[in-house]
Amino acid sequence: MSEDEILKIIAEGESSTVEFKRKSPELLKLAKEISAIANTKGGYLFIGVDDDRKIYGIDSEKEEKNKIETATHFFLEPTLDLEIYPINIKKKEILMAIIPNSEFKPHKVLIAEPNNITKKRAYIRVGEKSIEASSEMARLMTYQNPNNRKELNISISEKEKRLFNYLEKYERITVKEYCKLTNISKRTAERSLVSLVRAGIIQIHNDSANDYFTLV
């Protein structure tokens, strides 16, 4: 990638595929950013560039690279292999990590809790923010993983018919609204909605508050 191409990416600012860090944050935060980009559609992580696109540079390539590799290999499951390059730009050195659009989603962050309990949480990008993926989004990513693909059997019952009628009238629905509409549990609602997304009948939309679903 040429210097002009890199400068163009930086000039366009943060997005669903680009994250800037003036310096590497603590490892858990770094893992969340990497998880979010890999679980969305891949992209770039720049160290030494601030949110306002100003290039500050880094003090130690080795230290910053080690932080990224540690976050990736010890705080993510499954782990990711990133391409990490030091780049001299405007007389300053920055680090660029290329994060793949992974096939093996969701990449979950391992979060240590008291009593030796480890939580696993997936993250996604919504605009320039990294947010925790909803359980239905994480479930959908799991089904799309080539290691977990199963034959899809769809049956349209009364609850799906009520869902379609609701969407034709109101255009969108959340899991909570679907539970209330059909008097089913959250788990059952998620399974039903994810199956319909996989079948291409409805689509999921990521929102910083709640994911919602619409007809295709």
Language-model regions, residue ranges each:
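Conserved N-terminal catalytic/coupling substructures associated with nucleotide/phosphate chemistry
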Residues: 1-216
